[in-house]
From Swiss-Prot:
Lineage: Bacteria, Pseudomonadati, Pseudomonadota, Gammaproteobacteria, Enterobacterales
A GO cellular component annotation in the UniProt record: cytosol
Native organism: Escherichia coli O7:K1 (strain IAI39 / ExPEC)
BP GO terms, sorted: glycerol metabolic process; rhamnose catabolic process
Disulfide cysteine pairs (residue numbers): C68-C222, C353-C370, C413-C417
EC assignment: 2.7.1.5
GO molecular function terms listed in the Swiss-Prot or TrEMBL record: ATP binding; glycerol kinase activity; rhamnulokinase activity
Amino-acid positions noted as binding ATP in the UniProt annotation, renumbered to this chain: A13, S14, S15, G16, R17, T259, Q304, G402
Annotated protein name in UniProt: Rhamnulokinase
Gene for this chain: rhaB
Residues forming the catalytic site: D237
Keywords annotated in UniProt: ATP-binding, Disulfide bond, Kinase, Magnesium, Nucleotide-binding, Rhamnose metabolism, Transferase
InterPro entries reported in the protein's UniProt record: ATPase_NBD (IPR043129), FGGY_C (IPR018485), FGGY_N (IPR018484), Rhamnulokinase (IPR013449)
Function: Involved in the catabolism of L-rhamnose (6-deoxy-L-mannose). Catalyzes the transfer of the gamma-phosphate group from ATP to the 1-hydroxyl group of L-rhamnulose to yield L-rhamnulose 1-phosphate.
Broadest EC class assigned to this enzyme: transferase
Binding site for substrate: G83, H236, D237, T238, N296
Amino acid sequence: MTFRNCVAVDLGASSGRVMLARYERECRSLTLREIHRFKNGLHSQNGYVTWDVDSLESAIRLGLNKVCEEGIRIDSIGIDTWGVDFVLLDLQGKRVGLPVAYRDSRTNGLMTQAQQQLGKRDIYQRSGIQFLPFNTLYQLRALTEQQPELIPHIAHALLMPDYFSYRLTGKMNWEYTNATTTQLVNINSDDWDESLLAWSGANKAWFGHPTHPGNVIGHWICPQGNEIPVVAVASHDTASAVIASPLNGSRAAYLSSGTWSLMGFESQTPFTNDTALAANITNEGGAEGRYRVLKNIMGLWLLQRVLQERQINDLPALIAATQALPACRFTINPNDDRFINPDEMCSEIQAACRETAQPIPESDAELARCIFDSLALLYADVLHELAQLRGEDFSQLHIVGGGCQNALLNQLCADACGIRVIAGPVEASTLGNIGIQLMTLDELNNVDDFRQVVSTTANLTTFTPNPDSEIAHYVAQIHSTRQTKELCA
Protein backbone atom coordinates (compact mmCIF):
# COMPACT_ATOMS: atom_id res chain seq x y z
CA MET A 1 0.00 0.00 0.00
CA THR A 2 1.13 3.54 -0.79
CA PHE A 3 0.30 6.19 1.79
CA ARG A 4 0.64 9.95 1.89
CA ASN A 5 0.60 11.91 5.14
CA CYS A 6 -0.46 15.54 4.78
CA VAL A 7 -1.00 18.06 7.56
CA ALA A 8 -3.64 20.77 7.31
CA VAL A 9 -3.52 23.84 9.54
CA ASP A 10 -7.04 25.27 9.49
CA LEU A 11 -7.58 28.53 11.36
CA GLY A 12 -11.05 29.92 11.86
CA ALA A 13 -12.23 33.02 13.66
CA SER A 14 -13.20 31.06 16.77
CA SER A 15 -10.87 28.04 16.73
CA GLY A 16 -7.94 26.44 14.98
CA ARG A 17 -6.87 22.89 14.37
CA VAL A 18 -3.92 20.89 13.13
CA MET A 19 -5.19 17.81 11.31
CA LEU A 20 -3.31 14.82 9.93
CA ALA A 21 -4.67 13.24 6.75
CA ARG A 22 -3.67 9.77 5.61
CA TYR A 23 -4.37 9.03 1.96
CA GLU A 24 -4.21 5.48 0.64
CA ARG A 25 -3.57 5.55 -3.09
CA GLU A 26 -4.75 2.08 -4.09
CA CYS A 27 -8.22 2.32 -2.55
CA ARG A 28 -8.45 6.13 -2.76
CA SER A 29 -9.38 6.39 0.91
CA LEU A 30 -8.79 9.45 3.06
CA THR A 31 -8.86 9.52 6.85
CA LEU A 32 -8.48 12.52 9.14
CA ARG A 33 -7.12 12.63 12.66
CA GLU A 34 -7.18 15.69 14.87
CA ILE A 35 -3.73 16.34 16.30
CA HIS A 36 -4.28 19.62 18.10
CA ARG A 37 -7.29 21.92 18.52
CA PHE A 38 -7.07 25.35 20.08
CA LYS A 39 -9.15 28.44 20.65
CA ASN A 40 -8.99 31.62 18.63
CA GLY A 41 -10.79 34.85 19.29
CA LEU A 42 -10.73 38.60 19.41
CA HIS A 43 -8.53 40.56 21.80
CA SER A 44 -8.38 44.20 22.83
CA GLN A 45 -4.99 45.88 22.52
CA ASN A 46 -4.17 49.60 22.56
CA GLY A 47 -7.72 50.48 21.60
CA TYR A 48 -7.90 48.03 18.68
CA VAL A 49 -9.61 44.66 18.22
CA THR A 50 -6.77 42.29 17.35
CA TRP A 51 -5.66 38.70 16.81
CA ASP A 52 -3.04 37.01 18.99
CA VAL A 53 -0.87 35.78 16.12
CA ASP A 54 1.97 34.76 18.44
CA SER A 55 -0.33 32.39 20.32
CA LEU A 56 -1.67 31.01 17.04
CA GLU A 57 1.84 30.42 15.72
CA SER A 58 2.79 28.61 18.93
CA ALA A 59 -0.29 26.40 18.62
CA ILE A 60 0.55 25.60 14.98
CA ARG A 61 4.11 24.64 15.87
CA LEU A 62 2.89 22.55 18.80
CA GLY A 63 0.58 20.60 16.51
CA LEU A 64 3.26 20.03 13.88
CA ASN A 65 5.75 18.92 16.52
CA LYS A 66 3.22 16.41 17.89
CA VAL A 67 3.01 14.75 14.47
CA CYS A 68 6.78 14.56 14.21
CA GLU A 69 7.09 13.15 17.72
CA GLU A 70 4.90 10.22 16.64
CA GLY A 71 7.51 9.36 14.03
CA ILE A 72 5.15 10.04 11.14
CA ARG A 73 6.74 11.09 7.84
CA ILE A 74 4.94 14.25 6.74
CA ASP A 75 4.77 14.67 2.96
CA SER A 76 3.47 18.24 2.98
CA ILE A 77 1.80 20.99 5.04
CA GLY A 78 -0.87 23.53 4.05
CA ILE A 79 -2.40 26.49 5.89
CA ASP A 80 -5.80 28.12 5.42
CA THR A 81 -7.42 30.92 7.45
CA TRP A 82 -10.19 33.51 7.29
CA GLY A 83 -9.85 36.32 4.74
CA VAL A 84 -9.16 40.09 4.56
CA ASP A 85 -6.87 40.45 7.61
CA PHE A 86 -3.12 40.96 7.27
CA VAL A 87 0.19 41.40 9.08
CA LEU A 88 2.69 44.13 8.19
CA LEU A 89 6.44 43.46 8.22
CA ASP A 90 9.59 45.56 7.95
CA LEU A 91 12.66 44.74 5.86
CA GLN A 92 13.94 42.40 8.59
CA GLY A 93 10.64 40.52 8.69
CA LYS A 94 9.59 41.98 12.04
CA ARG A 95 5.98 42.99 12.62
CA VAL A 96 4.97 46.62 12.16
CA GLY A 97 1.91 47.71 14.12
CA LEU A 98 -0.79 45.38 15.40
CA PRO A 99 -2.55 42.47 13.65
CA VAL A 100 -5.91 44.24 13.70
CA ALA A 101 -9.04 42.11 13.25
CA TYR A 102 -11.74 42.81 10.68
CA ARG A 103 -14.35 43.41 13.39
CA ASP A 104 -12.48 46.51 14.59
CA SER A 105 -14.31 49.79 14.00
CA ARG A 106 -11.37 51.64 12.41
CA THR A 107 -12.88 51.29 8.93
CA ASN A 108 -16.19 52.96 9.80
CA GLY A 109 -17.29 55.26 6.98
CA LEU A 110 -14.43 54.39 4.63
CA MET A 111 -16.43 52.13 2.32
CA THR A 112 -18.88 54.96 1.64
CA GLN A 113 -15.95 57.31 1.08
CA ALA A 114 -14.43 54.93 -1.47
CA GLN A 115 -17.72 54.61 -3.33
CA GLN A 116 -18.06 58.39 -3.49
CA GLN A 117 -14.50 59.01 -4.63
CA LEU A 118 -13.94 56.07 -6.98
CA GLY A 119 -17.49 55.14 -7.93
CA LYS A 120 -19.24 52.03 -6.63
CA ARG A 121 -19.64 50.50 -10.08
CA ASP A 122 -16.00 51.14 -11.00
CA ILE A 123 -14.74 49.44 -7.83
CA TYR A 124 -17.01 46.46 -8.52
CA GLN A 125 -16.03 46.21 -12.19
CA ARG A 126 -12.37 46.19 -11.20
CA SER A 127 -12.54 43.71 -8.31
CA GLY A 128 -15.82 41.78 -8.65
CA ILE A 129 -15.89 41.67 -4.85
CA GLN A 130 -18.82 42.50 -2.59
CA PHE A 131 -18.81 45.64 -0.51
CA LEU A 132 -18.06 44.83 3.12
CA PRO A 133 -16.78 47.58 5.44
CA PHE A 134 -13.89 45.46 6.68
CA ASN A 135 -12.42 44.51 3.29
CA THR A 136 -8.65 44.93 3.16
CA LEU A 137 -9.11 47.89 0.82
CA TYR A 138 -10.67 49.88 3.66
CA GLN A 139 -8.44 48.44 6.38
CA LEU A 140 -5.35 49.68 4.55
CA ARG A 141 -6.92 53.10 4.05
CA ALA A 142 -7.67 53.24 7.78
CA LEU A 143 -4.10 52.28 8.60
CA THR A 144 -2.44 54.76 6.26
CA GLU A 145 -4.75 57.61 7.32
CA GLN A 146 -4.78 56.95 11.04
CA GLN A 147 -1.22 55.67 11.57
CA PRO A 148 0.94 57.36 8.91
CA GLU A 149 3.97 57.05 11.18
CA LEU A 150 4.04 53.30 10.40
CA ILE A 151 4.31 53.71 6.62
CA PRO A 152 8.10 54.31 6.39
CA HIS A 153 8.71 51.06 8.28
CA ILE A 154 6.47 48.81 6.16
CA ALA A 155 8.15 46.59 3.56
CA HIS A 156 5.61 43.78 3.19
CA ALA A 157 1.91 43.11 3.77
CA LEU A 158 1.06 39.43 4.19
CA LEU A 159 -2.45 38.05 4.51
CA MET A 160 -2.94 35.73 7.47
CA PRO A 161 -2.24 32.32 5.88
CA ASP A 162 0.73 33.75 3.99
CA TYR A 163 2.08 35.19 7.24
CA PHE A 164 1.98 31.84 9.03
CA SER A 165 3.53 30.10 6.01
CA TYR A 166 6.28 32.72 6.11
CA ARG A 167 6.86 32.06 9.81
CA LEU A 168 7.37 28.36 9.04
CA THR A 169 9.46 28.71 5.88
CA GLY A 170 11.02 32.18 5.80
CA LYS A 171 9.54 32.54 2.29
CA MET A 172 6.85 35.05 1.29
CA ASN A 173 3.84 34.22 -0.86
CA TRP A 174 0.58 35.90 -1.79
CA GLU A 175 -1.96 33.17 -2.51
CA TYR A 176 -4.63 34.05 -5.07
CA THR A 177 -7.90 32.80 -3.52
CA ASN A 178 -7.31 34.72 -0.32
CA ALA A 179 -5.90 37.75 -2.14
CA THR A 180 -9.20 38.15 -3.99
CA THR A 181 -11.05 38.71 -0.70
CA THR A 182 -9.14 41.97 -0.21
CA GLN A 183 -11.10 43.83 -2.95
CA LEU A 184 -7.68 44.87 -4.25
CA VAL A 185 -7.14 42.24 -6.98
CA ASN A 186 -8.20 43.12 -10.51
CA ILE A 187 -10.66 40.51 -11.74
CA ASN A 188 -9.32 40.69 -15.30
CA SER A 189 -5.58 40.55 -14.64
CA ASP A 190 -5.53 38.47 -11.41
CA ASP A 191 -2.98 40.99 -10.14
CA TRP A 192 -3.19 43.87 -7.70
CA ASP A 193 -5.24 46.76 -9.07
CA GLU A 194 -3.10 49.90 -9.08
CA SER A 195 -6.05 52.29 -8.84
CA LEU A 196 -7.51 50.53 -5.80
CA LEU A 197 -4.09 50.19 -4.17
CA ALA A 198 -3.46 53.89 -4.69
CA TRP A 199 -6.73 54.80 -2.97
CA SER A 200 -5.90 52.50 -0.05
CA GLY A 201 -2.63 54.35 0.52
CA ALA A 202 -0.64 51.12 0.30
CA ASN A 203 2.52 50.73 -1.74
CA LYS A 204 2.37 48.07 -4.46
CA ALA A 205 5.88 47.03 -3.43
CA TRP A 206 4.36 45.62 -0.23
CA PHE A 207 2.79 42.83 -2.29
CA GLY A 208 4.08 40.11 -4.58
CA HIS A 209 2.20 38.76 -7.58
CA PRO A 210 -0.67 36.48 -6.45
CA THR A 211 0.06 32.79 -6.98
CA HIS A 212 -2.57 30.16 -7.66
CA PRO A 213 -2.96 27.15 -5.36
CA GLY A 214 -0.58 24.27 -5.79
CA ASN A 215 2.93 25.71 -5.59
CA VAL A 216 5.47 24.91 -2.88
CA ILE A 217 6.20 28.07 -0.87
CA GLY A 218 9.19 26.71 0.99
CA HIS A 219 10.09 24.13 3.61
CA TRP A 220 9.57 23.76 7.34
CA ILE A 221 12.42 22.06 9.13
CA CYS A 222 10.98 19.72 11.74
CA PRO A 223 12.74 19.05 15.08
CA GLN A 224 14.23 15.88 13.59
CA GLY A 225 15.83 17.94 10.81
CA ASN A 226 13.67 16.84 7.89
CA GLU A 227 12.62 19.48 5.34
CA ILE A 228 8.86 19.34 4.75
CA PRO A 229 7.24 21.20 1.83
CA VAL A 230 4.72 23.90 2.76
CA VAL A 231 2.18 24.10 -0.06
CA ALA A 232 0.16 27.16 -1.05
CA VAL A 233 -3.29 25.61 -0.78
CA ALA A 234 -6.53 27.50 -1.47
CA SER A 235 -5.68 29.48 1.63
CA HIS A 236 -8.99 31.27 2.13
CA ASP A 237 -10.88 28.80 4.33
CA THR A 238 -14.05 29.12 2.24
CA ALA A 239 -12.11 28.39 -0.95
CA SER A 240 -10.82 25.20 0.68
CA ALA A 241 -14.31 24.32 1.94
CA VAL A 242 -15.75 24.65 -1.56
CA ILE A 243 -13.09 22.32 -2.95
CA ALA A 244 -14.31 19.68 -0.48
CA SER A 245 -18.00 20.29 -1.21
CA PRO A 246 -19.16 17.22 -3.16
CA LEU A 247 -20.93 19.34 -5.77
CA ASN A 248 -22.51 17.17 -8.43
CA GLY A 249 -23.45 19.04 -11.57
CA SER A 250 -24.20 22.65 -12.38
CA ARG A 251 -27.42 22.79 -10.34
CA ALA A 252 -25.68 22.32 -6.99
CA ALA A 253 -25.17 25.24 -4.61
CA TYR A 254 -23.05 25.30 -1.46
CA LEU A 255 -23.33 26.83 1.98
CA SER A 256 -20.15 26.94 4.05
CA SER A 257 -21.56 27.23 7.55
CA GLY A 258 -19.54 28.48 10.48
CA THR A 259 -18.90 31.85 12.11
CA TRP A 260 -19.89 33.16 8.69
CA SER A 261 -22.29 31.51 6.26
CA LEU A 262 -21.10 31.71 2.66
CA MET A 263 -23.70 30.68 0.09
CA GLY A 264 -22.92 30.40 -3.59
CA PHE A 265 -22.11 28.36 -6.65
CA GLU A 266 -19.11 27.65 -8.85
CA SER A 267 -18.72 29.35 -12.21
CA GLN A 268 -16.13 29.49 -14.95
CA THR A 269 -16.93 33.18 -15.42
CA PRO A 270 -17.56 36.02 -12.95
CA PHE A 271 -20.84 37.91 -12.59
CA THR A 272 -20.22 41.66 -12.43
CA ASN A 273 -23.36 43.02 -14.07
CA ASP A 274 -25.77 45.50 -12.49
CA THR A 275 -27.90 42.69 -11.05
CA ALA A 276 -24.88 41.23 -9.24
CA LEU A 277 -23.83 44.67 -8.02
CA ALA A 278 -27.32 45.46 -6.71
CA ALA A 279 -27.40 42.12 -4.85
CA ASN A 280 -23.86 42.65 -3.48
CA ILE A 281 -22.66 39.35 -4.94
CA THR A 282 -18.97 38.54 -4.71
CA ASN A 283 -16.75 36.71 -7.22
CA GLU A 284 -13.94 35.30 -5.12
CA GLY A 285 -11.16 33.26 -6.64
CA GLY A 286 -11.26 29.50 -6.48
CA ALA A 287 -9.04 26.61 -7.49
CA GLU A 288 -8.39 25.83 -11.16
CA GLY A 289 -9.49 29.26 -12.32
CA ARG A 290 -13.05 28.82 -11.08
CA TYR A 291 -14.98 31.62 -9.42
CA ARG A 292 -16.83 31.30 -6.15
CA VAL A 293 -19.93 33.37 -6.89
CA LEU A 294 -21.35 33.84 -3.43
CA LYS A 295 -22.80 36.06 -0.77
CA ASN A 296 -21.73 36.57 2.83
CA ILE A 297 -24.31 35.89 5.54
CA MET A 298 -23.55 36.77 9.14
CA GLY A 299 -23.87 33.10 10.16
CA LEU A 300 -23.40 31.44 13.53
CA TRP A 301 -21.46 34.42 14.88
CA LEU A 302 -24.77 35.56 16.36
CA LEU A 303 -25.21 32.26 18.19
CA GLN A 304 -21.56 32.20 19.32
CA ARG A 305 -22.01 35.57 20.97
CA VAL A 306 -25.27 34.52 22.66
CA LEU A 307 -23.61 31.36 23.99
CA GLN A 308 -20.77 33.47 25.36
CA GLU A 309 -22.96 36.15 26.93
CA ARG A 310 -25.40 33.66 28.49
CA GLN A 311 -22.57 31.27 29.49
CA ILE A 312 -24.25 28.34 27.73
CA ASN A 313 -22.11 25.21 27.53
CA ASP A 314 -24.64 22.54 26.49
CA LEU A 315 -25.42 23.33 22.86
CA PRO A 316 -27.33 20.07 22.12
CA ALA A 317 -29.67 20.79 25.05
CA LEU A 318 -30.22 24.32 23.79
CA ILE A 319 -31.03 23.08 20.29
CA ALA A 320 -33.48 20.52 21.72
CA ALA A 321 -35.25 23.25 23.70
CA THR A 322 -35.25 25.48 20.62
CA GLN A 323 -36.83 22.79 18.46
CA ALA A 324 -39.86 22.67 20.75
CA LEU A 325 -40.68 26.35 20.13
CA PRO A 326 -42.94 27.60 17.31
CA ALA A 327 -41.18 28.87 14.20
CA CYS A 328 -40.82 32.48 13.06
CA ARG A 329 -42.28 34.13 16.15
CA PHE A 330 -39.21 36.37 16.25
CA THR A 331 -37.24 37.21 13.09
CA ILE A 332 -34.39 39.60 12.39
CA ASN A 333 -32.16 40.30 9.42
CA PRO A 334 -28.84 38.66 10.39
CA ASN A 335 -27.09 40.73 7.73
CA ASP A 336 -27.92 44.03 9.38
CA ASP A 337 -24.53 45.56 10.15
CA ARG A 338 -25.70 46.24 13.72
CA PHE A 339 -24.79 42.59 14.38
CA ILE A 340 -21.15 42.79 13.17
CA ASN A 341 -19.75 43.32 16.67
CA PRO A 342 -22.28 44.83 19.12
CA ASP A 343 -21.44 45.35 22.77
CA GLU A 344 -24.17 42.84 23.71
CA MET A 345 -25.58 40.54 21.03
CA CYS A 346 -28.59 39.44 23.10
CA SER A 347 -29.65 43.04 23.70
CA GLU A 348 -29.09 43.91 20.04
CA ILE A 349 -31.31 41.04 18.87
CA GLN A 350 -33.99 42.03 21.35
CA ALA A 351 -33.80 45.67 20.26
CA ALA A 352 -34.20 44.67 16.61
CA CYS A 353 -37.35 42.71 17.47
CA ARG A 354 -38.69 45.56 19.60
CA GLU A 355 -38.13 48.09 16.82
CA THR A 356 -40.18 45.96 14.41
CA ALA A 357 -43.06 45.50 16.89
CA GLN A 358 -42.41 41.79 17.38
CA PRO A 359 -42.45 39.74 20.58
CA ILE A 360 -39.13 39.95 22.42
CA PRO A 361 -37.04 36.76 22.71
CA GLU A 362 -36.06 36.50 26.38
CA SER A 363 -34.97 32.95 27.12
CA ASP A 364 -31.88 31.23 25.75
CA ALA A 365 -34.02 28.99 23.56
CA GLU A 366 -36.04 31.93 22.23
CA LEU A 367 -32.88 33.78 21.24
CA ALA A 368 -31.53 30.67 19.51
CA ARG A 369 -34.88 30.12 17.77
CA CYS A 370 -34.80 33.69 16.50
CA ILE A 371 -31.29 33.17 15.11
CA PHE A 372 -32.01 29.82 13.45
CA ASP A 373 -35.29 30.92 11.85
CA SER A 374 -33.78 34.19 10.68
CA LEU A 375 -30.76 32.48 9.14
CA ALA A 376 -32.94 29.94 7.32
CA LEU A 377 -35.13 32.73 5.93
CA LEU A 378 -32.08 34.64 4.75
CA TYR A 379 -30.67 31.48 3.18
CA ALA A 380 -33.90 31.22 1.18
CA ASP A 381 -33.60 34.85 0.07
CA VAL A 382 -29.99 34.48 -1.03
CA LEU A 383 -30.53 31.17 -2.82
CA HIS A 384 -33.36 32.80 -4.78
CA GLU A 385 -31.10 35.77 -5.63
CA LEU A 386 -28.35 33.47 -6.86
CA ALA A 387 -30.76 31.45 -8.99
CA GLN A 388 -32.10 34.63 -10.57
CA LEU A 389 -28.58 35.88 -11.21
CA ARG A 390 -27.56 32.82 -13.19
CA GLY A 391 -30.99 32.15 -14.72
CA GLU A 392 -31.36 28.60 -13.42
CA ASP A 393 -32.80 27.10 -10.24
CA PHE A 394 -30.75 24.86 -7.97
CA SER A 395 -31.68 21.24 -7.31
CA GLN A 396 -29.65 20.69 -4.14
CA LEU A 397 -27.72 22.60 -1.51
CA HIS A 398 -24.55 21.25 0.10
CA ILE A 399 -24.00 22.53 3.65
CA VAL A 400 -20.41 22.02 4.78
CA GLY A 401 -18.33 23.08 7.77
CA GLY A 402 -18.98 23.00 11.50
CA GLY A 403 -22.48 24.44 11.16
CA CYS A 404 -23.65 21.41 9.18
CA GLN A 405 -23.76 19.46 12.47
CA ASN A 406 -26.85 21.49 13.48
CA ALA A 407 -29.62 19.20 12.24
CA LEU A 408 -32.35 21.66 13.23
CA LEU A 409 -30.85 24.46 11.16
CA ASN A 410 -30.25 22.07 8.25
CA GLN A 411 -33.93 21.06 8.23
CA LEU A 412 -35.10 24.66 8.59
CA CYS A 413 -32.89 25.54 5.64
CA ALA A 414 -34.33 22.71 3.53
CA ASP A 415 -37.89 23.72 4.42
CA ALA A 416 -37.39 27.47 3.90
CA CYS A 417 -35.51 27.02 0.62
CA GLY A 418 -37.71 24.18 -0.61
CA ILE A 419 -34.63 22.25 -1.67
CA ARG A 420 -32.85 19.01 -0.81
CA VAL A 421 -29.99 19.67 1.59
CA ILE A 422 -26.92 17.43 1.86
CA ALA A 423 -24.94 18.07 5.04
CA GLY A 424 -21.25 17.28 5.25
CA PRO A 425 -18.35 17.07 5.39
CA VAL A 426 -17.88 18.82 8.73
CA GLU A 427 -14.15 19.48 8.31
CA ALA A 428 -14.58 20.85 4.79
CA SER A 429 -11.85 23.51 4.98
CA THR A 430 -9.38 20.95 6.27
CA LEU A 431 -10.30 18.48 3.53
CA GLY A 432 -10.04 21.07 0.77
CA ASN A 433 -6.65 22.07 2.14
CA ILE A 434 -5.57 18.42 1.96
CA GLY A 435 -7.03 18.07 -1.53
CA ILE A 436 -4.71 20.70 -3.00
CA GLN A 437 -1.75 19.11 -1.22
CA LEU A 438 -2.58 15.72 -2.77
CA MET A 439 -2.85 17.32 -6.21
CA THR A 440 0.52 19.01 -5.68
CA LEU A 441 1.95 15.60 -4.74
CA ASP A 442 0.48 14.19 -8.01
CA GLU A 443 -1.82 11.82 -6.13
CA LEU A 444 -5.00 13.32 -7.63
CA ASN A 445 -5.73 14.89 -10.99
CA ASN A 446 -7.98 17.83 -10.17
CA VAL A 447 -10.75 19.16 -7.92
CA ASP A 448 -13.44 16.95 -9.45
CA ASP A 449 -11.26 13.90 -8.87
CA PHE A 450 -10.85 14.91 -5.23
CA ARG A 451 -14.60 15.44 -4.80
CA GLN A 452 -15.15 11.82 -5.81
CA VAL A 453 -12.87 10.81 -2.94
CA VAL A 454 -14.83 13.05 -0.55
CA SER A 455 -18.18 11.64 -1.73
CA THR A 456 -17.10 8.09 -0.98
CA THR A 457 -15.34 8.71 2.34
CA ALA A 458 -17.23 11.56 4.06
CA ASN A 459 -20.26 11.14 6.29
CA LEU A 460 -23.11 12.87 4.42
CA THR A 461 -26.70 13.33 5.63
CA THR A 462 -29.68 14.30 3.45
CA PHE A 463 -32.51 16.58 4.60
CA THR A 464 -35.68 16.55 2.51
CA PRO A 465 -37.81 19.72 2.45
CA ASN A 466 -41.16 19.51 4.25
CA PRO A 467 -43.67 21.82 2.52
CA ASP A 468 -46.04 21.49 5.50
CA SER A 469 -43.58 22.82 8.07
CA GLU A 470 -44.23 26.10 9.88
CA ILE A 471 -41.32 27.87 8.26
CA ALA A 472 -42.34 26.70 4.78
CA HIS A 473 -45.81 28.17 5.34
CA TYR A 474 -44.24 31.37 6.65
CA VAL A 475 -42.11 31.70 3.51
CA ALA A 476 -45.12 31.11 1.27
CA GLN A 477 -47.53 33.43 3.08
CA ILE A 478 -45.50 36.20 4.71
CA HIS A 479 -41.82 36.14 4.00
CA SER A 480 -42.13 36.71 0.24
CA THR A 481 -43.09 40.33 0.89
CA ARG A 482 -40.37 41.00 3.48
CA GLN A 483 -37.62 43.46 2.60
CA THR A 484 -34.11 42.53 3.69
CA LYS A 485 -31.25 44.93 4.13
CA GLU A 486 -28.02 44.11 2.34
CA LEU A 487 -25.01 43.40 4.53
CA CYS A 488 -23.06 46.64 4.44
CA ALA A 489 -23.76 47.25 0.75
